[in-house]
């Protein structure tokens, strides 16, 4: 039961379980959006900072880059080996792979114990779509993998994070 005041009249609203579930879903999806946007921002800052140092000819030591990246991984990614990931291969892309200003979430879908976020992306002047798959780990939603659609071959390909 919810009470609210409208034009000095108290209304009682009885909400069904379905509506409550929808509200819970909206809260969960907002949480996923927040996690994704924070991850995108931190990855963007990490890669942008590394690129600025490369351009200036003052490279940051790999140990410092790895430590900062590991902190981002620990905060946002599921705990699993990423053999081709940025942490293992120490790759820095230009422009940065992830940029929250160039992504727009278009769909959030729950599938069993995971949630998939689909977004439209503008990367290096090209439009693409990405799928971000989240899993719950230790009670927190963490990013498990990222795929990008290749319009050339019509397939989804993994982005190494």
Residue ranges and their predicted role:
Residues 32, 107-116, 123-129, 137, ...:
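Low-complexity, intrinsically disordered terminal/linker segments enriched in charged
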Residues 28-50:
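Short, aromatic-enriched amphipathic alpha-helices that serve as compact interaction elements
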Residues 3-4, 14, 19:
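Short hydrophobic targeting helices and cationic amphipathic motifs
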Residues 10-11:
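Tryptophan (W) side chains
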Residues 68-125:
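Surface-exposed, charged secondary-structure patches
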Residues 43-78:
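A structured, charge-rich N-terminal accessory region that forms the first stable segment of a protein
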């Amino acid at each position: 039961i919810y009470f609210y005041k409208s034009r000095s009249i108290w209304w009682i609203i009885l909400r069904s379980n379905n509506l409550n579930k929808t509200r819970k879903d909206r809260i969960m999806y907002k949480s996923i959006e927040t996690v994704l946007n924070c991850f995108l921002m931190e990855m963007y800052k990490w890669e942008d900072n590394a690129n600025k140092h490369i351009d200036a000819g003052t490279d940051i030591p790999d140990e410092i880059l790895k430590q900062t990246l590991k902190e981002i991984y620990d905060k946002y990614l599921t705990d699993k080996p990423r053999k081709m990931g940025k942490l293992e291969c120490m790759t820095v892309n230009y422009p940065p792979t992830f940029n929250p200003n160039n992504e727009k979430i278009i769909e959030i879908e729950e599938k069993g114990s995971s949630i998939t976020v689909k977004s439209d992306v503008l990367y290096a002047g090209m439009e693409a779509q990405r799928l971000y798959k989240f899993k719950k780990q230790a009670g927190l939603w963490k990013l498990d993998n990222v795929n990008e659609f290749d319009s050339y071959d019509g397939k989804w390909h993994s982005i190494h994070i």
